[in-house]
Structure formats: C-alpha cells, structure tokens
Amino acid sequence: MNLILLCSQILLLLFTVANCDGEHQLDSSMDLKSDSTKSAVLKNVAPKNDATQAEIAKDDVALKSGKKGDYVMEIDVSDIPLDDYPINNSKSRKNSSTLPSQILTDKPNQGSNQIALKALKHRLLMEQNNNLFLRNHSVSLMNEIEARKTDIIQARQLNIDLELELEALKRELSEMNAQNARKSTKSCKKRPSKDIASPVNQLQEVIVKNTYRNKYLTLLTQLAQKINYEIANVNNPATDVPTGKSPSEGNPSTT
C-alpha cells in the first residue's frame, strides 16, 4: 500500500513538472510570436507627414481654448492619410492576413491542452481519491484482522482452560470411583503362617487318630477273645495236663 502511494506521489510530481515546462514553453513561444508581430507591424507603419502634425497641433489648441461641451470636432474621412495605416500597406496586409491565422491555430491547441490538463487533473484527483479509499479500506481490514486474531487467541485460551478443567474433573471422578470401589469391597483378614500350615497338620492329625483308633480296636478285639477263652477254660478245666503248668500258661494265645 505504501508503494502505491509513493508511486502516485511520484507520478503527481512528474506531471506537475511537465505541466510547468509545457506552460513555460507555450508562454515563451506566444511571447516570441507577439514580439515578432509587433516588430513587423511597427516596421510596416509609415511615418506621419508634417501637414498632419500641424493639423493635429491646431486641433489640440482649439480643444484647450474652448469650453467643455461647446466644441465639436468634425473629421473628414478624406483628410485622414490612409497610407499611414498598416492595414492599407501591402506588407501590413500580408502580416495581418498571416497573424490571425497563427493566433487561430494556437488558440485551439491551447484549448485542447487546457482540456487535456483538466482531464489529467481530474483523473489524478480520482486516482488520489481511489488510493485514499483503498488505504482506508485496507486499514479497516487490518483492524478487523487484528480484532479477529485477538478473538481467536481468546477462544484458544478459553478452550485450553476448559480442557484443563475437564481433565481435573475426570481425575476427581476417577478418584471417587476408586474410593467407592474400596468401600464396596471388604478387606480380607490376614492369616499367620501357622494358620496357613494348619490344614496339613489337621490332615496328619486325622491320619494319626485313625491309625491309633484302628490299633485300639484290634487290641480290644484280641482282649475280648482272650477273656472269652479264659472264661471257657475256667468253666471246663482240662483233665490231662502233661506238666504241672496250668492250661492257661501253655496256651499260645496268651503270648
């Protein structure tokens, strides 16, 4: 944008310098032409005669001596020396015929130059207004962009804050779930090492008890058999005893 404004200012400066140079050249050419025409006219003017000078002097004296409003000057056309005027001279006729043509040819060019100058000035003003409008529009757009940037930054910061709050809430929720799980489950009592080995000892104890019980039962059965045998021997004593020993002593079951 600054480059466009700089280019427009440079073009304006060049345009004004060119216009000044053109106007200066046009004025100088017009001055030269007017000086040449004036010199040509002065050269072609013929000097006045002595008779005409004397008549002019008489008229001046009469005007001075007379009162205002009383003197009326009568001029005869035949008294005027027509040869003294440049319009009646051949050279002056040529110059008079050429002079208006040059002036007429210069005036349209000058008018066209002025029209072109006005058009260029109008176009330059339009370009300046357009550049000013574009600059203001660009400034407004930049301000809007900056405002949008600030809005985006604020929205991102708000999103970050919301994400942090969400993470904190998730952490608290997980802690609450863990606490609820701990409360819902009962803790198991710890057993000592003796309690861990008790089932084996109990099994061994049962086995020992069974073995001793079996042995006890066998002994009881043997004792009952012996008692019954002794009772039977007491009721029926033996007649032939080879030795002096009692029958109970010779019984192998007593051993």
Curated annotation (Swiss-Prot):
Location in the cell: Secreted, Extracellular space
GO molecular-function term, one example from the UniProt record: identical protein binding
GO CC terms of this entry: extracellular region
InterPro entries associated with the record: Male_ac_gland_sc
Record key words, sorted: Behavior, Glycoprotein, Secreted, Signal
GO aspect biological process, one term: mating
Name this protein carries in UniProt: Accessory gland-specific peptide 26Aa
Originating species: Drosophila sechellia (Fruit fly)
Protein encoded by which gene: Acp26Aa
